[in-house]
Amino acid sequence: MQTNVVSAQEWEAARQNLLLKEKALTHARDAMAAERRRMPWLAVEKNYEFDTPKGKASLRDLFEGRHQLIVYRAFYEPGVFGWPDHACRGCSMVADQVAHVAHLNARDTTLAFVSRAPQADIARQKARMGWEMIPWYTITDSFDADFDVGEWHGTNVFFRDGDKIFRTYFINSRGDEQMGGTWNYLDITPLGRQEVWEDSPAGYPQTPTYKWWNWHDSYVEGAAPDKRWVEVSDAGEAAFRNKQAGAKP
């Protein structure tokens, strides 16, 4: 494996040079966030209904009285790899990394996950995986299709002004990585995520993208990726890419 061992002075000089670029990236990210806050809003005209542990609820109810609502579409339902014992591996990783929601609530913001699994299955899965803190509801209508998450994970953001609800933001695919600490932590290590798409020095370990993902209670050190998961992951990625390509003008 290629390495470059230098003196303390040379190391500090390299770190300072990288720090300048990191600060520029931070400023660019701040500018992007400012632009995001100025995005136009889209009025939500339809009424949507969800199953919850307490019965039926509207989209407005999901705000829990707050003004902002973040909705992550997690794939846990019949037909998903791992069902009914597990949710999608990627969605499970996102759920594992949700911070204490009190911090979001303190900023007038509610986080919710939605899937098509029945509430009984969601409750069992939350208890087993330690996700009790995440409000997780069942989609009962066209909510997922209407908000671009019918076939792929994604995050929608809504704002409530009285009884009026607006869609203010949407992101999916790799954009959802910013909601997960695992990827950010790995990005500051010398080996990175160790996936084949990364630009790393020759000889650094790399494996097929996403294939190492697993449920947090199912990792086996040194074990090869599950063949069925590889097939499902590849098929899902291909379908998503083809759909994206077909949508381009």
Where do the model's predicted regions map?
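Non-globular targeting/processing and membrane-anchoring segments
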Residues: 1-107, 124-128, 141-249
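Conserved segment of the thioredoxin-like fold in thiol-based oxidoreductases
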Residues: 109-138
